């Protein structure tokens, strides 16, 4: 046919059989990618330390999505929470991956069959004998089936009525596990961090989809609406489908980046706003304060802080710190976290407790400044030592660790104090293994960042695709040069205003 590469989809115009074939093949590719990617991730995933080396630190992309839907066991004998199991059952990570690959193969065969046997009777209009599709009826069928799937997911899978439930955790990502969820029918269901909203919204949306599908199956569109919205044109279907996809992509980009019940931090890592707002730091200080109120020592109070909570309060886990084009997992950046060194408390020779000012998200370097409880600068690591007034040496800063591996250890050597002050800029201090993966020390983003960037980018691209194909289908006759007033003869010079018959010139 000699079509240019950007017009090759023309071959499925007016060919319903092969239109179906290419869509089945597309499904085969999507399912095949998902299954293959899952097997690859399982081959490289290390489940041994779910606290300091969780899936999101290792750059896992599809494992978190399987996990949030109820898959936690592997045929390798491990559980995602760190335990060992003897009977993982068929729906393990490998089982789901295998099911996707088998499904992909069946779709591949079905696509070939429909490509070869494209001229089926079902696609022929009995009145004209030509291939045609009843698009409003097909819309009704798809809406009905999507509604059934949506309702079933919300009413059975999420609630645990017939299914595992979904991943549910506390606000600080410490106690996450798979559990059944009751639908939230009150106003709390609209809170994006309430898991019950997932069940209730799927039930409600599914019910609406079923009713709307039945409506479109039983009621024909009015002729003027059919013609006005070009319902007989397959490009209208393409345009509106792209609209649905880009809208969904924008929504999930938002829920992923800003966080929600569907994007738990245990599976996708913390959000950047949790670092910006000192979210975990405040909870840590609250717990320490509660411990001190119970007459615990500082050492005892800090020792009771979960290592998992301390690890969230580290800038290396902020998805906005990694550049978009720095390939690799977080572990390839700052290394594999081995252990929490403890919380450093700095004091000057006058006895003031000093706090290191933390690095904001979008800084690569930041001055080391230590302030007291009132925010007054008491010490720093100066750029020019000749002009310094607050250097660690001059102020006599010491550091003492509470909790973690260095619990009870103190340092007064200025070089060591400055080393830990620099590291305290980045949040809680962890020992990081850079040798194993040859990590380069440059921060990487988490799967939360990659997912957001990918979906926001494609949503923008698909938005333009929707506008493009929508305009093509609405103004198809204009673009083809078919003008409804084509029969009106316009003669240059016959009117004072070109084409305006009310300004016809008088013949002298």
Swiss-Prot record:
It is a multi-pass membrane protein. InterPro entries: PS_antenna-like, PS_II_antenna-like_sf, PSII_PsbB. Pfam families: PSII. One of its GO terms (cellular component) is photosystem II. It is found in: Plastid, Chloroplast thylakoid membrane. The keyword Plastid applies. Its main location: plastid. GO terms for molecular function: chlorophyll binding; electron transporter, transferring electrons within the cyclic electron transport pathway of photosynthesis activity. GO terms for biological process: photosynthetic electron transport in photosystem II. Keywords: Chlorophyll, Chloroplast, Chromophore, Membrane, Photosynthesis, Photosystem II, Plastid, Thylakoid, Transmembrane, Transmembrane helix. The chain crosses the membrane at residues 21-36, 101-115, 140-156, 203-218, 237-252, 457-472. Binds multiple chlorophylls. PSII binds additional chlorophylls, carotenoids and specific lipids. It comes from the Eukaryota. One of the components of the core complex of photosystem II (PSII). It binds chlorophyll and helps catalyze the primary light-induced photochemical processes of PSII. PSII is a light-driven water:plastoquinone oxidoreductase, using light energy to abstract electrons from H(2)O, generating O(2) and a proton gradient subsequently used for ATP formation. PSII is composed of 1 copy each of membrane proteins PsbA, PsbB, PsbC, PsbD, PsbE, PsbF, PsbH, PsbI, PsbJ, PsbK, PsbL, PsbM, PsbT, PsbX, PsbY, PsbZ, Psb30/Ycf12, at least 3 peripheral proteins of the oxygen-evolving complex and a large number of cofactors. It forms dimeric complexes. PANTHER family: PHOTOSYSTEM II CP43 REACTION CENTER PROTEIN, PHOTOSYSTEM II CP47 REACTION CENTER PROTEIN. Belongs to the PsbB/PsbC family. PsbB subfamily. This is Photosystem II CP47 reaction center protein. The gene is psbB.
